[in-house]
């Protein structure tokens, strides 16, 4: 059966068809559903499993894991657990994940903060990204205007661009675990086949072909085939592997 809340109400633990919350709703315990749409506010105390799509244009707080096919967020979503999406995660709002995020395709046009690892086939970021662990994908495209902090990156093709703001002289500062970050920082390493980066600070970059663009600060560059370094980039050591 369908469940709909347009005022204020609660949904008991159980299995449902479509769930729609346009008011203020509380989900009590673990639920399974075919689809969920939240345009108001919702709080879920258990694991949420959705066979179809979860769409959030309001505000959601989840205490445990979110398991779904697709997840669209144009509002705000927070979870104390992890997110597993077999297909797509798309956000133009904000998502905060205390655990990890795993999906087929990740599209970020807002702000994403994941305390642990991100694992996906394809990732495209045109907003703000914080990943406390490993960002792992076959294809990684990051286009950052503000602060970005990632533990480490692994992928086949890695492209990182920094688009300067037209009306603001300085980059916005973001915080992660009380650390102030300006620009794009990868704390451990970037490893891939084809790597092309700009304005990145990283201890080690290792790949088959590596292009280090303007504004980069790299301690160790490792390559197996070829490399290029912009005249306004800083590289401490170069090593053929």
Name each model feature, range by range:
Residues 1-241:
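Extended beta-solenoid/beta-helix repeat architectures
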């Amino acid at each position: 059966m369908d469940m709909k809340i347009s005022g204020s109400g609660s949904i008991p633990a159980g299995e449902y068809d479509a769930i729609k919350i346009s008011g203020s709703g509380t989900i009590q315990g673990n639920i399974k559903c075919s689809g969920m749409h939240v345009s108001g506010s919702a709080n879920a105390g258990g694991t949420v499993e959705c066979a179809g799509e979860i769409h959030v244009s309001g505000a959601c707080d989840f205490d445990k894991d979110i398991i779904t096919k697709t997840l669209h967020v144009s509002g705000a979503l927070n979870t104390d657990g992890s997110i597993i999406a077999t297909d797509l995660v798309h956000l133009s709002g904000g998502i905060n994940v205390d655990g990890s995020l795993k999906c087929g395709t990740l599209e970020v046009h807002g702000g994403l903060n994941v305390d642990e690892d991100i694992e996906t086939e394809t990732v495209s970021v045109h907003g703000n990204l914080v990943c406390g662990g490993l960002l792992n994908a076959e294809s990684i495209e990051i286009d950052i205007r503000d602060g970005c902090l990632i533990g480490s990156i692994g992928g086949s093709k890695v492209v990182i661009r920094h688009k300067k703001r037209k009306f603001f002289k300085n980059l916005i500062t973001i915080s992660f675990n009380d650390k102030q970050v300006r620009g794009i920082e990868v704390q451990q390493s970037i490893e891939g086949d084809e790597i092309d980066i700009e304005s990145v600070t990283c201890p080690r970059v290792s790949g088959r072909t590596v292009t280090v663009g303007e504004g980069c600060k790299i301690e160790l560059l490792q390559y197996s085939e070829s490399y290029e370094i912009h005249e306004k980039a800083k590289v401490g050591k170069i090593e053929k592997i």
